[in-house]
Amino acid sequence: MKIFILLLLLSFTTLASTVEDLINESQEIVGVQSRTEYFSRKFLGTDYDPAGPLGEGLEGEIDQDPLYRFDRFDCTTFLETVISLARSRDSEDFNSIINLIRYDKGEVDFLKRHHFTDLQWIPENIHAGFFKEANRNFFKDDEIFTARADIDIKGWINKFTIDSLRLPSLTLEEKQRRLLNLKERVKNEPVREATVEYIKIDRILENPDLLSTLPDVVVVNFVRPNWNLKETIGTNMNISHQGLLIRIKDQFFMRHATQVSPLKVVEVHFLNYLERFKNHPTLKGVHFLEILEH
């Protein structure tokens, strides 16, 4: 166990140095959106991690994966990392910002993490001043639809097993104790409705010019209205994936950590990507967030 902790401490020291290097390399790039484009391009080719590569670090009660890393991402941690770097002047800035993006008021705790994009991640990060809703600013009212889902955090946690915990150095007995404690903490958690506005994929494919007024760099969320996942994860939800749209020579490309081959951060033509979801039974639309400057 001591060796495990020592290795983690060494890796954290290396990561802090990496943050400083990344930020120093980007000093001449001005503006959060421009810096977001820069850092998202820098991480193209990075491995996708289906298990979720980030946690609460060494002090984590449930997930002791690192608070940040640069060698692997899922779709959300890719966004969180890139935008945190884009807004930072040094490693101290970065540590503070990534925690604010990932956690309620920046308090590092598994149950305060923004696990649900529609219920937590979007509204909390709008409130924190990192984003603002783009749909109402760039699309007409008759082009906007609303998805609703009941988010059952207690039902989600009750689906957790010992294998859901990321606690490599703990005994089975201690893991069981922590799992029981986690379920106890959410026993009175109410079901809450999450709403998110979206533009239909089919409508965008019919009229790609709808995208023409969007900013050059924007967050895109993929909407599956009231997606029924109760049997698998214990709750419904509205959003299944996230990425960044980047305008390149008057066309939008999406950079995202993909869970299908090649399992890496990739850049794809956005309209071509949407084509595969035409008339899809559950994936109906996209939601946009404008990235705010400082």
Predicted regions and their residues:
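Sec-dependent N-terminal signal peptides
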Residues: 3-12
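Boundary at the C-terminal end of the N-terminal hydrophobic targeting segment
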Residues: 16-18
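Start-of-domain marker
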Residues: 22, 26-27
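Sequence/structural signature of beta-propeller domains
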Residues: 32-49, 53-58, 71
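Acidic/His-rich structured neighborhood in mature extracellular/periplasmic domains
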Residues: 51-201, 212-215, 224-226, 239, ...
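Helix N-cap / beta->alpha transition motif
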Residues: 194-207, 267-269
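Generic recognition of flexible, low-complexity loop/linker segments
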Residues: 206-210, 229-232
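C-terminal soluble interaction/assembly domains
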Residues: 218-294
